[in-house]
C-alpha cells in the first residue's frame, strides 16, 4: 500500500530514488516550506514532462555516480513508481547526491508497478487515474541511429558516455 502523500519528481531522478541509490532529493527551502514537505513515508510520482536535454544531463550525472538509468522510452512518466521515507531535511550534506540548497534525506525505497496519476507541486494527495505519459519521438530513437541500436552494439564492451558533460538544462552549473 502506497502512502497517501506523494512527491512528483522528474525522470530520470524519480527512477534513481527508487532504483539507483539516490538518497537526497534537492529542493529550495521555499519549495519545502510551501509544499508542506516534512519527514515521513511518501510515494514517489514520476512527473509527466521530460525533455531530451534534461534526460541527457540526468543520465550523464547519474553515470558519474556509477548509476546507469534505463533508456528514456523505458522510464514511466505520469505515474507513481514506489515509496520512500524522508528521514530528515538538511541544508548541508557530504553526500554526493546533495546539490542544495536543501535536501530531503531519503531511505528505504520500495518500487511498485507504475500507477497512472496526475502530479502536483509539493506533497500532494494522489488518486489513481489517467494514463502513463506517451513515449515521445526523440525517446524512441535515443542512442539508436536509424532506430536500430546498431551504433550501441558495435562496441558492447565499452561504457556509453559523453566526452564532455552535456549542458545542464536548468539552474546554475555545478
What is each residue range found by the language model?
Residues 1-174:
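Structured alpha/beta reader/binder surfaces that contact nucleic acids or chromatin modification marks
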Amino acid at each position: 500500500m502506497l502512502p497517501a502523500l506523494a512527491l512528483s519528481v522528474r525522470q530520470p531522478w524519480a527512477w534513481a530514488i527508487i532504483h539507483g541509490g539516490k538518497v537526497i532529493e534537492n529542493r529550495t527551502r521555499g519549495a519545502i516550506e510551501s509544499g508542506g514537505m516534512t519527514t515521513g513515508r511518501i510515494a514517489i510520482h514520476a512527473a509527466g514532462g521530460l525533455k531530451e536535454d534534461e534526460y541527457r544531463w540526468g543520465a550523464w550525472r547519474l553515470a558519474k555516480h556509477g548509476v546507469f538509468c534505463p533508456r528514456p522510452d523505458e522510464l514511466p512518466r505520469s505515474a507513481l513508481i514506489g515509496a520512500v521515507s524522508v528521514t530528515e531535511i538538511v541544508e548541508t550534506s557530504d553526500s554526493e547526491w546533495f546539490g542544495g540548497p536543501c535536501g530531503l534525506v531519503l531511505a528505504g525505497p520500495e518500487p511498485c508497478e507504475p500507477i497512472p496519476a496526475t502530479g502536483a507541486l509539493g506533497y500532494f494527495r494522489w488518486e489513481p487515474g489517467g494514463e502513463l505519459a506517451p513515449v515521445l519521438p526523440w525517446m524512441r530513437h535515443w542512442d539508436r541511429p536509424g532506430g536500430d541500436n546498431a551504433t550501441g552494439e558495435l562496441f558492447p564492451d565499452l561504457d556509453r558516455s559523453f566526452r564532455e558533460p552535456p549542458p545542464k538544462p536548468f539552474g546554475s552549473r555545478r
